[in-house]
A protein has these predicted regions:
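Conserved phosphate-handling catalytic cores of large alpha/beta enzymes
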Residues: 65, 69-77, 82-145
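Compositionally biased, low-complexity/repeat regions
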Residues: 247-258, 356-456, 462-463, 467-470
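Active-site loops and adjacent core secondary-structure elements that bind or stabilize anionic groups
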Residues: 108-336, 341, 360-362
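Cofactor-cradling patches in redox/metallo enzymes
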Residues: 11-21, 27-97
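Amphipathic alpha-helical packing elements
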Residues: 69-91, 177-213, 446, 451, ...
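ATP-dependent carboxylate/acyl-activation modules
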Residues: 1-51, 260, 283-291, 298-370, ...
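Active-site proximal loops enriched in glycine and acidic residues that flank catalytic Cys/His/Asp
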Residues: 1-3, 13, 29-32, 50-58, ...
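Acidic, low-complexity intrinsically disordered tails
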Residues: 151-161, 166, 461-462, 466, ...
Length: 527
């Protein structure tokens, strides 16, 4: 797993599948710098290198790693996998950085064996690599064509189409306390009741919704066996307290100022203690559709309404790694992965349970809520809990503000890595919004004018924020002087896949055909 990323369940499954097919696998673990991966590949005389990552900053790290392979003259096949990755990202971002060897996106463990076999075959390797590269060239071209049809608004126009809320009749509920509240060693048995099992099966690449998957004609038998093992282990986890769950929640007076949410120290609302910066959708919408930002759901300061914002961080991973390593050292890789997958499910269940208690008890804006587990999974509740680094706020750096307000590291032992992943990995954090009209959405691709504005509001250099926001940029960052705005008549720059929100932009000065075509178009050239 690349530098700054802590997630390894999928990687571990791939490793086991390859080992079962008589391949030797050297697993370097998590948060591994590029230099260490390259050094180990040289020392061990590796035939193939595989990279994995879950959070979006890992995409840039993979692109950097590919460029390092090229710079250092290595010619090893490079496999790319993980939840944030895609064929489009691999074709447009990684493959152009590494021309000396084949780059292959592997979307699941079952495909890994066939890919490795082709790359290890003296007869097949060259033809297979050529096929993949030709396929990626087509993907890049299709991606470019698709972007030409997508129209985006200037930031000013997008703000003019913000979510309209009638604040004149709104009276926010007041939380039962301000500041933070810590929950140490939360009862695991309470979390079991609200586990969402569908993602658990997805970890094992079993497609289907729970509980219907248990009776599926294709994967039902395997799913039932896996579920039985999981329930037995879960019973032991709870009974023997293999690891503990801890959480911290908090509420603060807050009001929106433009696209920002200003957080105050107390009800006097005279001393700001933090600011959450939000991003706004810029894709041109159909009539009646709005360009949302999370700040739209907090009462503006000039309304005089006393609104609030909440935050949380929870973990079920305290002790998880020790248990997983115990199984691994006993050569029980299956149980090692199973315990990690269950810790993830418990962490998500903890987030669900705390949000439920916030709505009914701690903030109390929905005291009479009576939703069952299925309704909770479908998010039929009032209010939202968006998380930094996810579609409604794709900037992972906003976690730093949340963690500072919660004092999360001291309170519950959860830390942020250099890429703003949470450690332990089985942790969840986010914000609480109470407005009944708030909803989840994806920001999608954004233009340079918004990135300039966002960087200025955060007080950070433009190039730094372009790096953190790379997966959602609808332009190619360059060393040229930034423009102040875009016009609605400009053709959009070649961008990152609007369907795939995890696509990163190209590096400055990239010489791939994708860029050449764009530069020719800008210069008025044909073709």
């Amino acid at each position: 797993t690349v530098k700054g990323d802590v997630h390894d369940i999928g990687k571990n499954i791939v490793g086991i599948v390859l080992q079962c097919n008589n391949y030797e696998v050297i697993d370097l673990g998590v948060m591994v710098p590029a230099a260490k991966i390259i050094e180990t590949a040289r020392v061990e005389k590796a035939d193939i290198v595989g990279l994995s990552g879950l959070i979006t900053p890992s995409l840039d790290e993979m692109g950097y790693f590919a460029a390092e392979l090229e710079r250092q003259g290595l010619k090893l096949p490079l496999l790319i996998g993980g939840a944030t990755t895609s064929r489009v990202h691999t074709a447009v971002k990684i493959d152009p950085n590494y021309q000396s060897g084949p780059v292959v996106h592997v979307n699941d463990a079952s495909r890994a064996v066939g890919v490795v076999a082709s790359l290890m075959s003296a007869e097949r390797r060259e033809a297979y690599a050529s096929e993949v590269r030709a396929e990626y060239a087509k993907i890049s071209a299709a991606h470019f064509r698709a972007q030409q049809d997508k129209k985006r608004l200037t930031l000013a126009a997008a703000r003019a189409n913000a979510v309209p809320i009638d604040w004149s009749t709104y009276r926010p509920a007041t939380p039962t306390f301000l500041g933070t509240k810590v929950f140490s060693d939360y009862p695991l048995e309470e979390l079991v009741e609200v586990i969402d099992w569908t993602p658990f099966f997805q970890v094992w690449e079993l497609t289907g919704r729970f509980p219907a998957i248990l009776d599926d004609k294709v994967v039902g038998e395997t799913a039932r066996s896996l579920y039985d093992d999981a329930r037995k282990m879960l019973e032991k986890i709870v009974k023997e307290k293999w690891f503990k769950a801890s959480g911290v929640i908090g509420f603060w007076p807050a009001n929106s100022v433009g696209d920002d949410v200003v957080v105050y120290s107390d009800e006097s609302r005279t001393t700001p203690i933090a600011t959450y910066h939000t991003l706004r959708q810029q894709l041109e919408k159909r009539e009646g559709r709005r360009n949302a930002a999370l700040s739209d759901f907090i009462a503006p300061k000039d309304t005089g309404i006393a609104d609030y914002i909440g935050g949380f961080a929870v973990t079920a991973g305290l002790g998880e790694d020790e248990i997983a390593m115990r199984f691994k050292n006993a050569n029980d890789d299956y149980s090692s992965i199973l315990v990690k997958a269950l810790a993830d499910r418990l962490a998500e269940a903890f987030a669900e349970r705390m949000h439920q208690r916030v709505r009914k008890e701690f903030w109390g804006y929905a005291p009479d809520e009576t939703l069952n587990n299925e309704q909770l999974i479908k998010e039929e509740y009032k209010g939202i809990r968006p998380a930094p680094g996810y579609p409604a706020q794709p900037d992972h750096t906003e976690k730093a503000t949340l963690f500072k307000l919660l004092d999360a590291t001291r309170a519950i032992g959860v830390e942020l890595t250099e890429s703003f992943a949470m450690w332990p990995g089985s942790s969840v954090s986010g914000l609480y919004y109470s407005h009944p009209e708030s909803y989840y959405f994806g920001v999608g691709k954004i233009e340079r004018d918004q990135v300039e504005d966002y960087a200025a509001r955060k007080g950070r250099p433009l190039q730094e924020m372009e790096r953190w926001l790379a997966p959602i940029l609808n332009y190619i960052p360059s060393r040229e002087a930034p423009v102040s705005s875009i016009s609605s008549g400009d053709a959009p720059a070649p961008a990152n896949d609007a369907v795939d929100a995890d696509m990163s932009s190209h590096p400055p000065g990239c010489g791939c055909a994708f860029h050449l075509r764009y530069r020719n178009r800008k210069a008025g050239a044909n073709g």
